[in-house]
Amino acid sequence: MSQEKLKSKVEQASGSLKEGAGKLTGDKELEAKGFVEKTIAKGKELADDAKDAVEEAVDVVKEKLK
């Protein structure tokens, strides 16, 4: 697992914890902040996955052109 992917997973977990704590305590602001943090981290993870897929595809094309 790449460093970026690991960081995204940690941020997702942190966001989930904040969101859950906000729900539990009735703190709508904390709940919203947690949701946003979790969602942004998931987006970063998906972008990293897409980057990896493109890099792999480029490598395959390069090998076929040799």
Swiss-Prot record:
It holds the Pfam family CsbD. Residues 1-10 have a biased composition (Basic and acidic residues). InterPro entries: CsbD (IPR008462), YjbJ_sf (IPR036629). Coiled coil: none annotated. Residues 1-23 are annotated as: Disordered. Belongs to the UPF0337 (CsbD) family. This is UPF0337 protein SAG0606. It comes from Streptococcus agalactiae serotype V (strain ATCC BAA-611 / 2603 V/R).
